[in-house]
UniProtKB/Swiss-Prot annotation:
The beta subunit is responsible for the synthesis of L-tryptophan from indole and L-serine. GO terms for cellular component: cytoplasm. It is an enzyme of class 4 (lyase). The gene is trpB. NCBIfam families: trpB (TIGR00263). This is Tryptophan synthase beta chain. Keywords: Amino-acid biosynthesis, Aromatic amino acid biosynthesis, Lyase, Pyridoxal phosphate, Tryptophan biosynthesis. Pathway: Amino-acid biosynthesis; L-tryptophan biosynthesis; L-tryptophan from chorismate: step 5/5.
Length: 406
């Protein structure tokens, strides 16, 4: 682990250059720099503008359905026989995941900037659906770049995006997953800077995206903190979330970072195991490098070439992680651990049977970690987990693996 000094606050970053310690920054083509700086200026104005915040709050309540509930998982808690388990139910949001929180915020920014075309990248298709949804709501054309592999394994979401009026462009380069989709979206943006807004779906990319996405997603943790105090009269002992690029995780983690009594764990995609290359555990098994405009932990070879990762879950199938997570790892504030495909699949089925909630494969990784940790904790202790998405999109993948023809 890189030793990083502990700051006075874990919530004060990034600095004016968009850095969290040695991570983050703005590594972009010269043609994009003026646009990135425009975006940063607009973001700084918007976040201090009461009218912008009021519109965001109004759409959150009436379009997304916020606040999302805090749910005590009674049967899972009883089954595991340890800590009380609570879920932040982000899968109940409009479009079925946390992704919409960020999309609403960014499309309001795009409108403020006078942009007339939206582009986005997507892995699991949840961010693509959320982007297409907000584009439809605000009457803007939308192009979604999606790896060809993901187009195949996320058919329901591809259909949803098309229904919503978005153009889905399959990307066959590389392994045809999220990294490749992001590369294509960046290429599009460079050539269409005047009219196009790039709606990034995770807490990565060049500054100000990691900060912006985190702030739009922090509504999760802010609500959860209030709800937990109302339900239990105190904060949780442990907060857990799955981490791909890391937007759902930073959204629930950030409001708790300066509460020393709260332990925080991020769960990476361990895929088929960390020995080979078939995983996406960037922090557990990667090293710092530069990808998609920011310095962060990446899966790369000794020459700095980005490896093709693997995860059963399309949304975690990314060979990097948001820069703030890299910094939180190095400061020791957050622990990052891997969960394998088979453990996530088991957790998916366990939650479905015990609580009547079909989770997405992404948060199923976090559920698997909850299943490991809860029995080792006291019955008076509390776990809070971010249930970031619903599993409708994954039933074909799971059905195939379990040998159930759909």
């Amino acid at each position: 682990m890189n030793e990083t000094p502990k700051p006075n606050s874990f919530r004060s970053g990034p600095d004016e250059d968009g850095r969290f310690g040695i991570y983050g920054g703005r590594f972009v083509a010269e043609t994009l720099m003026p646009l990135i700086l425009d975006l940063q200026d607009e973001w700084n104005r918007a976040k201090n503008d009461p009218a912008f915040q009021a519109e965001l709050k109004h759409l959150g309540a009436h379009y997304i359905g916020r606040p999302s509930p805090l749910y005590f998982a009674e049967r899972l808690t009883a089954e595991l026989g340890g800590a009380k388990i609570y879920f932040k139910r982000e899968e109940l949001n409009h479009t079925g995941s946390h992704k919409i929180n960020n999309c609403i915020g960014q499309i309001l920014l795009a409108k403020r900037m006078g942009k007339t075309r939206i582009i986005a990248e997507t892995g699991a298709g949840q961010h693509g659906v959320a982007s297409a949804t907000v584009a439809a709501r605000f009457g803007l054309p939308c192009v979604v770049y999606m790896g060809a592999t993901d187009v195949e394994r996320q058919a329901p979401n591809v259909f949803r995006m098309k229904l919503l009026g978005a153009e889905v462009k399959p990307v066959t380069a590389g392994s045809g997953t999220l990294k490749d989709a992001m590369n294509e979206a960046l290429r599009d943006w460079v050539t269409n800077v005047e009219d196009t807004y790039y709606l990034i779906g995770t807490a990565a990319g060049p500054h100000p995206y990691p900060e912006m996405v985190r702030d739009f997603q922090s509504v999760i943790g802010i609500e959860a903190k209030e709800q937990m105090l109302a339900a239990e009269g105190r904060l949780p002992d442990l907060v857990i979330a799955a981490v791909g690029g890391g937007s759902n995780a930073i959204g629930i983690f950030h409001p708790f970072l300066d509460d020393p009594s709260v332990k925080i764990v991020g769960v990476e995609a361990g895929g088929k195991g960390l020995q080979g290359d078939e995983h996406c555990a960037s922090i557990t098994a990667g090293s710092p490098g530069v990808l998609h405009g920011n310095r962060t932990y990446l899966l790369q070879d000794s020459d700095g070439q980005i490896k093709e990762g693997h995860s059963i879950s399309a949304g975690l199938d990314y060979p990097g992680i948001g820069p703030e997570h890299s910094w939180l790892n190095d400061t020791g504030r957050v622990d990052y651990v891997p969960i394998m495909d088979h453990e996530a699949l088991e957790a998916f089925q366990t939650l479905t049977r015990l609580e009547g909630i079909i989770p997405a494969l992404e948060p199923s990784h976090a559920i698997a970690e909850v299943i490991k940790r809860a029995p080792t904790m006291g019955k008076d202790e509390i776990i809070l987990m971010n249930l970031s998405g619903r599993g409708d999109k994954d039933i074909f993948t799971v059905g195939k693996i379990l040998g159930m023809g759909l």
